[in-house]
Amino acid sequence: RRRGRREVLHRQDRRRAGRYHADVRCTLPGRDHPGYGESLKIMVWGCLIVGLILFLIARFSVKGKGEYGEDRIYDILQKVDGYKATLPNCYLPKGNGETAEVDLIFLHESGIYVFESKNYSGWIFGSENQKYWTQCFSDRRGGTKKYKFYNPLWQNDTHIRVLQKILRNKNVNIYSYIVFGNDCTLKDVRLSQLNYYVIQRRELLKSVLENAMYYGRVLSNEDIDNLYRMLLPYTEVSPEEKETHNRNIQEKYRM
């Protein structure tokens, strides 16, 4: 009887499943149905539109723009010839309980490149001696909107000093790169220091290649491998550590 009852229940489940699948099939026209092709096109276009909307939200949000800029820098650096290693998003300990977040460290035969990505638009004004730089926009009324942001050269100088303490070697060539997005205009950015580079992303590959050619090889393959192993753990941080870092930065650079 138990076996017979199980078989009856099993047949009932199959019938219910059959009705469910039949109901689902009825919601879409069959391949031979006159409206099948039109329905398929609507579904495909709907998926594409939703995907595009999600991409644009991610691309043009503050966080999304920052990540996009860093990803593009990473991709460009892979085109540089020679032995190399790339470390994105390094959280280097300062020794006081705080961390310095380096957008990207590029280990290459010609030295160590430390990148700060600023995927900004508008006009950019600043010099290496100013605490704050200015980003300007033209608004719809014909006026100008201005925003201040902390001197990225000073920001990257902090990153480099922390990196030098970790490496315990100040004799390695270290280059400070501030890379702005292609949608901005560097109107009045004055530099005097060597090893300082403030450029747009479209200039990055040419700049690094010229720099590598000028300085030649200063790091061996073994040097690069050792540096990579030393710094890799600083890219593996928890979400809680990232949140603590972001909170400290917001408090420190609040104007």
Language-model-detected regions and their locations in the chain:
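Surface-exposed interaction regions that form or flank ligand-binding interfaces
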Residues: 37-100, 107-112, 118-126, 137-255
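Polar interaction faces of repeat-based domains
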Residues: 128, 133
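Short hydrophobic/charged patches on amphipathic alpha-helices used for structural packing
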Residues: 21, 102-103
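Acidic active-site catalytic centers that drive phospho-/nucleotidyl reactions
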Residues: 13, 103, 116
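P/S/T/G-enriched low-complexity
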Residues: 1-37
